[in-house]
Amino acid sequence: MKLRSSAITQGVQRSPNRAMLRAVGFEDDDFNKPIIGIANGYSTITPCNIGLNDLAKQAEKAIKDWDGMPQMFGTITVSDGISMGTEGMKYSLVSREVIADSIETACNAQSMDGVLAIGGCDKNMPGAMLAMARMNIPGIFVYGGTIKPGKLNGEDLTVVSAFEAVGQLTSGKITKEKLIEVEKHCIPGAGSCGGMFTANTMSAAIEAMGLSLPHSSTMAAEDQEKIKSTQKSAEVLIKAIKENIRPLDLLTKQAFENAISVVMAVGGSTNAVLHLLAIAHSSGVELSLDEFEKIRQRVPVLCDLKPSGKYVTVDLHKAGGIPQVMKILLEAGLINENCRTIENKTIKEMLLDVPAEPPSDQDVIRPFDSPVYKKGHLAILKGNLATEGSVAKISGIKEPILTGPAKVFESEEDCLKAILTEQIHSGDVVVIRNEGPVGGPGMREMLAPTSAIVGQGLGEKVALITDGRFSGGTYGLVVGHVAPEAAVGGNIALIQDGDSITVDAIQKLIQVNIEEAELKRRRSLWVKPKPKYNSGVLGKYATLVSSSSKGAVTDQNC
């Protein structure tokens, strides 16, 4: 087997290259071993990533034990939970591209033979997957693990509990002292946010596509099994290099369909739609919003998980994790059994010893004939407000239909102020625009407004639509990723206060109820907004980024 790294290790002309490698610990025999990058997302910025360095060191040792040469390098992270509701959140989706670009750059510049990527916070997972697909060298993803639930008076808490408590405080439902108690107890240690929010959703999707080990996506960050799984991941990667198993061998159209099915079954985040579209783009796989809707129609929500449900991800792990969910779907004919994994097994082989039915002593994972919801919770809506499409999350509500007057805001901050001063009422359709990939730029998540609405008891009585995104912690009648976005002239830019808007997840419709002639009149008066940034990261991003309906990628025109 000829190693890619031979480009820097073999031949007399590579003596200077070897000299550099000797300075970082290479010996004579090491130049014939595979060089494996460890893309380490360690950071003290966020609890999601604070434990990653320990896992990276375990991976480093295991790679050496299996006769590989590890080379560790850092990737960035942005804490969505900390930047949420601020200008800093504009950098969150941007960080997905920075992570992908940094991994691709480091691995390709150093002619690495494989990569083991370790991540925790939301954009770490899709960022790593974009890089793996682009490079197509053997790779495996190690998830840093989920956080255990916080506890207060016997109740399980997550970070979303704190966001909702803000709304509860402003509506007089709790005291400031109770808010502080929630704040102090909702995040007890290391790990990614504990519900089926974006990080856990994307780790589940990666496991479903075969690029991480079975059960690894639901493990708690602080449990010993996470270390063992990391060590095993290093061993599996070495074997994949020897067998030349590459990401694009695994990232087939059927693998993406499997991932979408799992996302629906676990009640995952709307962000999975955006990220899977982007990963498919980097993989050369044709994937559209319409395919998410087709899968939603046949795949039920099987897991009762927060934000809209009862349990957290560690409970899912105890109940059998993603393999149990996949086995139920496999038995129902809803996932492809022939897709392969990084262990060079088919999905059918991987799930051979998993029971066909979930354990009877739990209700985290429901049997197929007794689901939480009969259809998936991520609906693709189209209409004159979203001709390219939009993504509605309809879990946690009894009636996913609302027609009401628009209350229009040009930014998240303006909207949140109106909510907290009780200017939003039952039946309203809240519109937050100019928060899209270009207009934000960066497509901020609207967790603060949606949580405040829920906290005030309006979660089933108010709809919120935006060209921005939603956190995985959001639930209620919310519609995001509206495309085309306002900044490029989408019809969401033409809505005025008081316009009647219909959101109907049953008919898959999102529309403003005015005459086409009036829309044309307003369009004739519309002026394209000036860019908010003319330089730097955000200026560059706004210039390059595609529509959210295409995954908000930055290399679409390459």
Curated annotation (Swiss-Prot):
Give the Gene Ontology MF terms in alphabetical order: 2 iron, 2 sulfur cluster binding; dihydroxy-acid dehydratase activity; magnesium ion binding
Q: Does the keyword Chaperone apply?
A: no
Q: What EC number is given for this enzyme?
A: 4.2.1.9
Keyword field: 2Fe-2S, Amino-acid biosynthesis, Branched-chain amino acid biosynthesis, Iron, Iron-sulfur, Lyase, Magnesium, Metal-binding
Sites of the modification N6-carboxylysine?
K123
Keyword Flavoprotein found: no
Q: Where does Mg(2+) bind?
A: D80, D122, K123, E445
Q: How is the cofactor bound?
A: Binds 1 [2Fe-2S] cluster per subunit. This cluster acts as a Lewis acid cofactor.
Give the source's domain of life in one word.
Answer: Bacteria
Q: Which cofactor does it need?
A: [2Fe-2S] cluster; Mg(2+)
Reactions that this protein is recorded to catalyse: (2R)-2,3-dihydroxy-3-methylbutanoate = 3-methyl-2-oxobutanoate + H2O; (2R,3R)-2,3-dihydroxy-3-methylpentanoate = (S)-3-methyl-2-oxopentanoate + H2O
- Which InterPro entries does its entry note? DHAD_IlvD/Edd, Dihydro-acid_dehy_C, DihydroxyA_deHydtase, DiOHA_6PGluconate_deHydtase_CS, ILV_EDD_C, ILV_EDD_N, IlvD/EDD_N
Q: Where is the active site?
A: S471 (proton acceptor)
Write out the residues that bind [2Fe-2S] cluster. Answer: C48, C121, C193
Q: Biological process (GO) annotations? A: isoleucine biosynthetic process; L-valine biosynthetic process
Q: From which residue to which does the signal peptide run? A: none
Pathway info: Amino-acid biosynthesis; L-isoleucine biosynthesis; L-isoleucine from 2-oxobutanoate: step 3/4; Amino-acid biosynthesis; L-valine biosynthesis; L-valine from pyruvate: step 3/4
- HAMAP family annotated for this entry? IlvD
The Swiss-Prot or TrEMBL record describes its family as follows:
Belongs to the IlvD/Edd family.
Q: What functional role does this protein have?
A: Functions in the biosynthesis of branched-chain amino acids. Catalyzes the dehydration of (2R,3R)-2,3-dihydroxy-3-methylpentanoate (2,3-dihydroxy-3-methylvalerate) into 2-oxo-3-methylpentanoate (2-oxo-3-methylvalerate) and of (2R)-2,3-dihydroxy-3-methylbutanoate (2,3-dihydroxyisovalerate) into 2-oxo-3-methylbutanoate (2-oxoisovalerate), the penultimate precursor to L-isoleucine and L-valine, respectively.
- Subunit (UniProt): Homodimer.
Full protein name: Dihydroxy-acid dehydratase
